[in-house]
Amino acid sequence: MKNKKTFSRRDFLKVGSTVGSGLVIGFHFPFGNKLFCAEKQNSFKPNAFIQVLPNDKILISIIKAEMGQGVWTSLPMLIAEEMEADWSKIEVSQSSESSFFGTGGSSSISGYGWKKMRQAGAIAKEMLVEAASMKWKVSPVECEARSSVIYHKRSGKKISFGAISDSAAKLKVPKKARLKDTKDFSIIGKDMLRTDSMAKVNGTAP
């Protein structure tokens, strides 16, 4: 497929670390055709975000418009898979960080989403796990994340993503994060209730 773009560390950015705001990671979701991109290539402007709130909610804001193709569900699923997040705690919204919105060419998943969103989720998880390991004074390899909770295998200690999110926000964004093997997927490939269904039924959809 043409116009696919590789990405580097500068494609991911820790947006803020205000106490009480949790962990916020911004990243740039590029567009398939450079001719229609209104933003300069050398200016990194986040247009998608992951925010882990202290109350355990995970807010995902994406630039791709939901036009019935299911991207408000499929793209967050990629993030949740790599984060080891509890799907019931995911909330999705339309990003308004850019005046240019790019939805088309069936590129949301195959073009950029598959690796981009997974990498964003993996980075968020790695930062949360590292923060928990520092709190417990153990190695990150001794910890694992499951359903929005981080566990220390030996001691039995556990802490939720939200409870450690402010600490994670103080850490540097890692250069890279390891992605899961496809055989270990627990969310991707499953039938999920669409995140936009209720809002469209009750008339609150944007």
Where are these regions (language model features)?
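Cofactor-binding beta-sheet edge motifs in enzyme active sites
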Residues: K2-G26, F36-P206
